[in-house]
Amino acid sequence: MIQEKEHKSVVFSCEVFPPKRDDDIYQIYKTLDEIKTLKPDFISVTYGAGGSNSKKTATIAAYIQNICEVEALAHMTAVGMDEASLRALLFELKKKGVENILALRGDKPRTMSQEEFDQRYFKYATDLIPEIKKNGDFFIAGACYPEVHPESKNQEEDIQHLKQKVDLGLNCLITQMFFDNNAFYSFMDKLEKAGIDIPVHAGIMPVTAAKQLGTSVTLSGSSVP
């Protein structure tokens, strides 16, 4: 489990995305074989919008865990998930030896109305965490925003929601990307004051294209110096 890595002064990880085309999964395997040589502590695998790539997420996570022999962190989103599909995915991950999950709300599909969203069985990460804990001894990570979740009124409200997730059983937090270290240090101070004392891993992203940066900044709520 990732928990065994938490004692290290520096925890290094990478993230991969399931391919849209089935044929491209072998290219992901090749990339993972290269990433393995960097000796990451874990590799996370994202989850498609609305659960569109859930099977690929489980398959790639299993490759990371069993072939690359690196801890795999499978993303899991509330949006697009129901009780049956959650249990099926957890069973599949457990069967494949994947013990680490990143519990997220996920992005609402553009075609989903607010009314449809409100009718979902799971809407937020806070809905997922108790169900994950009931269905296996998983290490559960959560996401956090050093510069406030774009949908939160303010950072105080944001940290209250974060504390709720931690109290439900999160084992660690991974931040969205940020560029301002001072914002991160300030955020960490506020977490301590709120009684949040689980490990927090800083999320960074190499900038390879201006368009990519713009999209990522919008999703993460981070400021650009």
What are these regions (language model features)?
Residues 1-14, 21-22, 131:
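N-terminal amphipathic alpha-helix/helix-capping segment at the start of soluble metabolic enzymes
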Residues 31-46, 165:
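Catalytic domains of carbohydrate-active enzymes, especially glycoside hydrolases
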Residues 39-60, 108-120, 171-185:
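Glycine-rich, proline-tolerant flexible connector loops at the mouths of alpha/beta enzymes
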Residues 11-27, 72-84, 141-157:
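Active-site mouth loops of central-metabolism enzymes
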Residues 78-95, 119-123:
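Glycine-rich anion/phosphate-binding loops
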Residues 25-33, 51-70:
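Glycine-rich, positively charged N-terminal anion/phosphate-binding segment
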Residues 23, 119-145, 197-225:
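Active-site pocket-lining/capping segments in soluble small-molecule metabolic enzymes
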Residues 10-18, 43-45, 72-76, 101-103, ...:
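Hydrophobic faces of well-ordered beta-strands that scaffold small-molecule active sites
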